Every structure is written in C-alpha cells, then in structure tokens.
C-alpha cells in the first residue's frame, strides 16, 4: 500500500481536518464510529487513508495537535469522537498565543517528542508509507511555529518521504491576529527546505467565493472549511480511489515543481455553485475547465494574466471522458492567452477519477455530476508573497511586537534572515519568468 499520514496542526489545521474526515467518511461509506455502512467494495484504495483494526473498524491515519485543548476537545466530544483513537488527539495546556516563537521554541518544544512518537506509531502500521499531508495556518502561533518544528523533525526521521502542505494564508477579512505577517514569513522561511509542495489557500479568496458563488451573506469558518475539504478531497481522490491517472504523492511534485523552492501551486476548483443555481445549470467538461482559468475561482488572489505558467495539472472527477477533456483543453489553448515559460512544454497533465464529488449533507455546495481541480504552478503566486512581505516590512520597520518573540528565546536576527529568504523567493519567481526574455532578445538581435 502507499499510505499517507495526515497531520492537522493548530486550530485551522484541526478544523479543516474535521471537515475533511467527515467528507472522506462519506465518500468511502464509513460511519462516524468507523464501521462501514455499505459492505466495502473490492477496491481497497481507501486504505491509504484508513487503517483497519482487529475489530474491523476503520481509523484515519491522522493525528491532530494543538497546544491548547478547546478545538481538539470538540473532536473528542463531537459526532466523530469514536472515529479517532484517543492517542491521535494531542493537546497541550497553554496555547501559542499567536506567537511563532512560542509554537517553535517554548510551548511547542515540550510537545514535539510526544507528537513524533505518535506519528512513529502510525508510520509503523503502514506497509509502504508514501508521505505526509500537513494541514495548518501560516498566521497562528501553533500553525506557524509548531508546524515548522515538526517538519524539521520529520525531515530527520523520514528523510525521503514526501511532505505536502495545505496552508491557510492570512486574510484581512478573517484575520485573527495583527502579527500574522511575522508568523507567516518566519514559518515559510523555516519550512521552505523541508516541504516538497505547498497548496496555499487564501482565506480572503475562499471568503469571496462563498459570498459570491454560494450566496452566503457572512461566511463562517465552517463554510470556508467545507469548501476547502472538497478541494483537499479532489487533490487526494487519486490516492483514495482507483483512478486513471496521478496516483502518487511524488507524481504531484514531478509534474508541478520545476525547482525545489518554486513549490507553491495555485489551486482552482470548479464548479462552486449552490444547489439553487445547479438546478438551472448544466455544467459540461468544457465549461468547468474554462472556469478554472477564471481568477474568481482561485484559492489565492493573484492575476495569472500577469504571470507565466510553468506546469498545469487538471484533476477531473465524476462523469468525464478523456475525449471531452482533450477538446476542452485544446479550446483553452486556442482561446485564452495562456503564457507558459519558454523552457516548459505546454502540456497539461490530466487525472480522471470516476467517483463524482459528494457534497456534505447540510453543506453549501450542490450535488454535481463532475468537477475539476486545477493545480498550476504560475509565477503570479509571487504576488501573495509580495503582499505578505509588505505587511511584514511595515511592522518590522518599527520593530513592533518583536519583543514578544525575543522574550520566548528567539533571536531578533531570525526576522531579518527570514525576510531575506522571502525576498530571495520573490526574486526566484521573477527570474523564472524573465530570464528567458533576455535570451530571446539576444537571439532576436543576432
């Protein structure tokens, strides 16, 4: 088997975890107590995410960690309390108080050995561990500080195993702390060399999608997380179901990451429509494919027209045949002004999974016959870093709030180091897009 272990860290990670496991259970007909509602089919691909116990119960290969108990306690007492083994839910007594240094140096340090042991137990129950999916936010103290501490540890203990992150990018609408830019820059710097691929989700983009496409007046975290869980489900469907293509974690990297540091694909999902609208719309493969190139459906606010594509991966699910996909992609190539970098063939990697998306009961999304999730590596995503770096600079110029970090044992030099690394990352993106212009001009002159 090629198992994946999911690690949910901090409030955002755990709450997204709740939404994801609720959806995975629905998709695989597993009840909240871990038993099957329908007898399992011969396809046991779901075992990549669930482990069977001696009592024929299915337990998620997952761990939830938070440095304070309230959010994980909701799992311990909620509908899915019997799904997880108590040892998979780990909490501390005091939170990281939105402070990266507390999550990484003081409070987090005390917990990392225990978390590491629990992950080791999960890994030992796998026959061929493929890698880790790590869910967290950039802005929280636990999400930023503890995640980077744990990723360093995973790199040491499981060297070559893939590590993919689903990371929540801070947004003004749903901001929970003024120091989010500090935490985000620090965690990105620390995890850059440990992470293989990071799918960023910008809360502001998701907030707007819920508001605009799903007619939710004031979207809550529950609304946001349910939408995020559909995206995670699409990206991981090929690992959990027998599919035609894209079955492996390493395959994502091979197809999406041209250089080790340029590992932040842009995620777009379609169709995102409410039940009322779905009633009146028939969404063909061509239409949903075209929707993926609308900036309104992106999970991070940026303008792909201003950037260049390095790679594109289309993951379809439901009632989709390859012929329709080929026609749809050919139309995109002719109708849209997609700019690919010169050194990259304009091939689209396609995955098709025949399992249609299942909406959560009582959720906001309509039941549709087919959906697509596009993962594209585009230089436009550097805009997200530029926004974050700008906010970091405004505060750091005044050294605002820095004493809270230093008093937790962090050195002030780490701020400058992290900021320089992100400046280098922005420059890397620039070079990927522009280096080749110079070559063209020289070729044109000669």
Swiss-Prot record:
Record-listed E.C. numbers: 3.6.5.-
Top-rank lineage group of the source organism: Eukaryota
Cofactor: Mg(2+)
Motif MREC motif, residue numbers: 1-4
Reactions performed catalytically: GTP + H2O = GDP + phosphate + H(+)
Residue sites binding Mg(2+) per the record: 68
Entries under SUPFAM superfamilies matching the protein: Tubulin C-terminal domain-like (SSF55307), Tubulin nucleotide-binding domain-like (SSF52490)
Subcellular location: Cytoplasm, Cytoskeleton
One GO BP: mitotic cell cycle
Pfam entry (one): Tubulin
UniProt-listed PROSITE patterns: TUBULIN (PS00227)
Active-site residues, record numbering mapped to chain: 251
Chain residues that bind GTP: 11, 68, 137, 141-142, 176, 203, 225
GO cellular component: cytoplasm; microtubule
Keywords attached to this entry: Cytoplasm, Cytoskeleton, GTP-binding, Hydrolase, Magnesium, Metal-binding, Microtubule, Nucleotide-binding
InterPro entries in alphabetical order: Alpha_tubulin, Tub_FtsZ_C, Tubulin, Tubulin/FtsZ-like_C, Tubulin/FtsZ_2-layer-sand-dom, Tubulin/FtsZ_GTPase_sf, Tubulin_C, Tubulin_CS
Family, as annotated: Belongs to the tubulin family.
Free-text domain note: The MREC motif may be critical for tubulin autoregulation.
Miscellaneous note of the record: This tubulin does not have a C-terminal tyrosine. There are at least seven alpha tubulin genes (alpha-1 to alpha-6, and alpha-8), and a pseudogene (alpha-7) in chicken.
Subunit comment: Dimer of alpha and beta chains. A typical microtubule is a hollow water-filled tube with an outer diameter of 25 nm and an inner diameter of 15 nM. Alpha-beta heterodimers associate head-to-tail to form protofilaments running lengthwise along the microtubule wall with the beta-tubulin subunit facing the microtubule plus end conferring a structural polarity. Microtubules usually have 13 protofilaments but different protofilament numbers can be found in some organisms and specialized cells.
Protein's name in the database: Tubulin alpha-2 chain
């Amino acid at each position: 088997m090629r198992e994946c272990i999911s690690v949910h860290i901090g409030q955002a990670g755990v709450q997204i975890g709740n939404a994801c496991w609720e959806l995975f259970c629905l998709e695989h007909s597993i009840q909240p107590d871990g038993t099957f509602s329908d007898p399992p089919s011969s396809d046991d691909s779901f075992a990549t995410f669930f482990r069977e116990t001696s009592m024929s119960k299915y337990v998620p290969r997952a761990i939830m960690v938070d440095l304070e108990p309230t959010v994980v306690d909701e799992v311990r007492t909620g509908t899915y309390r019997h799904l997880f083994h108590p040892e998979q839910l780990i909490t501390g007594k005091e939170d990281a108080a939105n402070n990266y240094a507390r999550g990484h140096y003081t409070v987090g340090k005390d917990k990392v050995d225990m978390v590491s042991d629990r992950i080791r137990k999960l890994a030992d129950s796998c026959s061929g561990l493929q890698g880790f999916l790590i869910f967290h936010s950039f802005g929280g103290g636990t999400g930023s500080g503890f995640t980077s501490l744990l990723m360093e540890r995973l790199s040491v203990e499981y060297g070559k195993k893939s590590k993919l992150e689903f990371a929540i990018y801070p947004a003004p609408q749903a901001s929970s702390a003024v120091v989010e830019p500090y935490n985000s820059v620090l965690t990105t710097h620390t995890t850059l060399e440990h992470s293989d691929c990071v799918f960023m989700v910008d809360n502001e983009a998701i907030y707007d999608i819920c508001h605009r496409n799903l007619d939710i007046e004031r979207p809550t975290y529950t609304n946001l997380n349910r939408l995020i869980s559909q995206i995670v489900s699409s990206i991981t469907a090929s690992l959990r179901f027998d599919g035609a293509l894209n079955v492996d974690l390493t395959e994502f990297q091979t197809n999406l990451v041209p250089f080790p540091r340029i590992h932040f694909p842009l995620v777009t999902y379609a169709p995102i429509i409410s039940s009322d609208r779905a009633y009146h719309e028939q969404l063909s493969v061509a239409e949903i494919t075209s929707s993926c190139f609308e900036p309104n459906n992106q999970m991070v606010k940026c303008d792909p027209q201003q950037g260049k594509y390095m790679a594109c991966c289309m993951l379809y699910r439901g009632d989709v045949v390859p012929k329709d996909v080929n026609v749809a992609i050919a139309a995109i190539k002719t109708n849209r002004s997609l700019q690919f970098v010169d050194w990259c063939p304009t091939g689209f990697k396609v995955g098709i999974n025949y399992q249609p998306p299942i909406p959560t009961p009582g959720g906001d999304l309509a039941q549709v016959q087919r959906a697509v999730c596009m993962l594209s590596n585009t230089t436009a995503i550097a805009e997200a870093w530029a926004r974050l770096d700008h906010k970091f600079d405004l505060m750091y110029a005044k050294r605002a709030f820095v004493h809270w970090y230093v008093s937790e044992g962090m050195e002030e030099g780490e701020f400058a180091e992290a900021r320089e690394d992100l400046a280098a990352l922005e420059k890397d993106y620039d070079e990927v897009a522009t280096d080749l212009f110079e070559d063209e001009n020289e070729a044109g002159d000669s």
